[in-house]
Amino acid sequence: MRPWQTAVPAEDREIFDRGGFGQRQEWGRRPAVIVVDVCASFLGPRKPTAEAVNTVATSCGQVGWDTLPTIRRLLDTARAAGLPVIYTTPTPTTRTTKKPSNHGEEGLRIPDEVAPQPGELVIRKPKASGFLDTGLATYLRKQGVDSLITCGVSTSGCVRATAVDGFSHEFTVFVVEDCCFDRSQFFHNASLYDMNAKYATVVTLEETVAFLTTRAKEAA
């Protein structure tokens, strides 16, 4: 079993299993990739998370930097398959907090390793979900999208909110577990379990790459 599959107690897992939760969904015919909030303010310094948050309160630290290569591979594969790629970042804020949040323009910078390509949409969102007051659902429908392949940060926060709202807008949602990261490994795993049980299908990068590669070959 994968780590997130054992994130909840066995007695709770049994309840979900008996209820038939967590049924595997079929890949859609026209997926899009949603990259949630992979920007400087959520990465922070290349340090353990407990140290990184002392510099920037929203940091995930080294765990975020370590996830960038897997996100890059997902993006390379998706682009080669002709999928739309959409990014979200927070709306800039000058709000004062006890520790700096780095949500100004510099904090919203997407690292070069996973930067948008020309023509790819970057949405600035006012709240956790990529759908709230952004026009994302309308944009996706105009593109003919029927399913979402979701990655980014934080698994328990904006990724989850975007996945749940994607489900509520009647898209089939997939969350790529090894392309998501969080300040808390516990909340990362627990959120993956919860999303998989109710709102999305949690998949690995390898599963996703295999699907997209096959799809690209069939379309050629």
Over which residues does each language-model region extend?
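Active-site-adjacent betaalpha module
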Residues: 1-32, 76-81, 98-220
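Acidic-leg catalytic submotif of subtilisin-like serine proteases
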Residues: 28-44
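Catalytic metal-binding/acid-base residues of hydrolase active sites
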Residues: 35, 39, 91-92, 154, ...
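Short, flexible, mixed-charge acidic loops at enzyme active sites
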Residues: 44-52
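A short acidic, glycine-rich active-site loop
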Residues: 55-69
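A short, N-terminal amphipathic alpha-helix
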Residues: 65-84
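Glycine- and small hydrophobic-enriched segments that form the cores of compact globular domains
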Residues: 71, 94-95
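Short beta-strand segments at enzyme active-site cores
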Residues: 83-90, 176
